[in-house]
């Protein structure tokens, strides 16, 4: 079975939500393993929003990492604010990891090669490759 990590900006458009929903459907059908999700853009509302969406997709418990140093472009995201407000503190105690250590751990623990789907900003993927070129060549 193919192993995936999704890296997404989870921002103002819908490509991220569609990609996550499609991956969740493939997981439910037993076609793939979604090892984790990385968010490479940051708003404080991102965490409860994406966790609620993942929960709704049947992906509760899937590891999540957020690049908290990523740029907050402000703006007016269509769904982050309303979803975060709707769920309140429901996800406040869910652990959120740092991107590169999580990706390295997931790649090391995987039972085969790992494919990374990159949507948005590539700084987390670039940092992973910079730190572990040899392991990336072998496993990603």
Label the predicted regions.
Residues 1-139:
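N-terminal acidic, glycine/proline-rich low-complexity segments
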